[in-house]
């Protein structure tokens, strides 16, 4: 064997070892990348679940806000209706008070007239 053959063989062996080391390093990096991918997939699933829960909360809050808005509108309508009824009752109350005062005044006038007539009858 010649020195050249031995050197070529040595270089080939070193190249082979270097390639094996590189392959090992690449396999290690691939395993780490696969592990990171699995971790990120789990994290993504957790985040997707969290997003779904938040969307459900938002839908629930929207429904509650809609219900509250409808209730508020209903209460405002009822308030307006009750205020109108109150104004009508106050007007009726005022009218009845005036009638009572007029009846009292009329009654007092009739009483005075009766007393005057009674005085006239006594004089006869």
Curated annotation (Swiss-Prot):
Self-associates. Associates with microtubules and forms a fibrillar structure partially linked to the microtubule network. Interacts through its C-terminus with PLK1. Interacts with ODF1. Interacts with MARK4; the interaction is required for localization of ODF2 to centrioles. Interacts with TSSK4. Interacts with AKNA. Interacts with QRICH2. Interacts with CFAP58. Interacts with BBOF1. Interacts with CCDC38. Interacts with CCDC42. It comes from Mesocricetus auratus. GO terms for cellular component: centriole; centrosome; cytoplasm; microtubule; sperm flagellum; sperm midpiece; sperm principal piece; spindle pole. The keyword Phosphoprotein applies. Detected in sperm flagella (at protein level). Seems to be a major component of sperm tail outer dense fibers (ODF). ODFs are filamentous structures located on the outside of the axoneme in the midpiece and principal piece of the mammalian sperm tail and may help to maintain the passive elastic structures and elastic recoil of the sperm tail. May have a modulating influence on sperm motility. Functions as a general scaffold protein that is specifically localized at the distal/subdistal appendages of mother centrioles. Component of the centrosome matrix required for the localization of PLK1 and NIN to the centrosomes. One of its GO terms (biological process) is regulation of cilium assembly. This is Outer dense fiber protein 2. Keywords: Cell projection, Cilium, Coiled coil, Cytoplasm, Cytoskeleton, Developmental protein, Differentiation, Flagellum, Microtubule, Phosphoprotein, Spermatogenesis. Belongs to the ODF2 family. It is found in: Cytoplasm, Cytoskeleton, Microtubule organizing center, Centrosome; Cell projection, Cilium; Cytoplasm, Cytoskeleton, Microtubule organizing center, Centrosome, Centriole; Cytoplasm, Cytoskeleton, Spindle pole. Residues 13-124 form a coiled coil. Tyrosine phosphorylated.
């Amino acid at each position: 064997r010649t020195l050249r053959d031995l050197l070529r063989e040595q270089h080939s062996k070193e190249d082979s070892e270097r390639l094996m080391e590189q392959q090992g390093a690449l396999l290690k990096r691939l395993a780490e990348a696969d592990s990171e991918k699995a971790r990120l997939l789990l994290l993504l699933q957790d985040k997707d679940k969290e997003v779904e829960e938040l969307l459900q909360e938002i839908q629930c809050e929207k429904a509650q806000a809609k219900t509250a808005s409808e209730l508020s509108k209903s209460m405002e309508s009822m308030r307006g209706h009750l205020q109108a009824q109150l104004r009508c009752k106050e007007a009726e109350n005022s009218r009845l008070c005036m009638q009572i005062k007029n009846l009292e005044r009329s009654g007092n006038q009739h009483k005075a007239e009766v007393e005057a007539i009674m005085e006239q009858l006594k004089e006869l």
